[in-house]
Amino acid sequence: MDYRQLHRWDLPPEEAIKVQNELRKKIKLTPYEGEPEYVAGVDLSFPGKEEGLAVIVVLEYPSFKILEVVSERGEITFPYIPGLLAFREGPLFLKAWEKLRTKPDVVVFDGQGLAHPRKLGIASHMGLFIEIPTIGVAKSRLYGTFKMPEDKRCSWSYLYDGEEIIGCVIRTKEGSAPIFVSPGHLMDIESSKRLIKAFTLPGRRIPEPTRLAHIYTQRLKKGLF
């Protein structure tokens, strides 16, 4: 798959923040109408201190049948700095993206979207590069305040930055911690909430696209795939 190269990656942190502040102005939070046919999940892990592994899994929806899996392993040069995850993981994701043959309708990232100090988590940032609707799904809160949803499957609450709604917190599995969902690009809050609920099977905490992508990253790290 093609993508737009919007900036250099070899930037110091202070310049990376300036890039984020400029790119955030280009984000479009628009409703996603209808149902997707193909959904991708993205997961990244770090087998070594300076080595990263990116996996993209494309699924048929609503069967969640796996259609394609691509990966890219390579050197990580950007330091770990909260809020600048895209500069650490983005280059590897894009190299994996280039290998992809099946164009997804929606891409789900293991990370943040709008729920970010500068409103540009990895789902938003990469969404601008690939120009496909994206959603960020995180296992923990990076930014914002919320009221804990009740311990009932599919209960939820909004995530706020002051009075602005920046995402939602969804209890996908009773007895488990909620997940943090926010739109990336070409997606809005209500659509991202609706889709992630639909992508999460009963008894699962994590939606199928990123859950399956994570399984493949673990297999690849162990040399099993």
Curated annotation (Swiss-Prot):
Keyword Cytoplasm attached: yes
Top-level taxon of origin: Bacteria
Enzyme category, top tier: hydrolase
Named cofactor requirement(s): Mg(2+)
Interaction with target DNA (site feature) positions: Y80
Keyword tags: Cytoplasm, DNA damage, DNA repair, Endonuclease, Hydrolase, Magnesium, Metal-binding, Nuclease
Subcellular localization: Cytoplasm
EC number(s) from the headed UniProt entry: 3.1.21.7
Gene3D superfamilies in alphabetical order: archaeoglobus fulgidus dsm 4304 superfamily
Family to which this protein belongs: Belongs to the endonuclease V family.
Function noted in UniProt: DNA repair enzyme involved in the repair of deaminated bases. Selectively cleaves double-stranded DNA at the second phosphodiester bond 3' to a deoxyinosine leaving behind the intact lesion on the nicked DNA.
Stated name of the protein: Endonuclease V
Organism: Thermotoga petrophila (strain ATCC BAA-488 / DSM 13995 / JCM 10881 / RKU-1)
Organism phylogeny: Bacteria, Thermotogati, Thermotogota, Thermotogae, Thermotogales
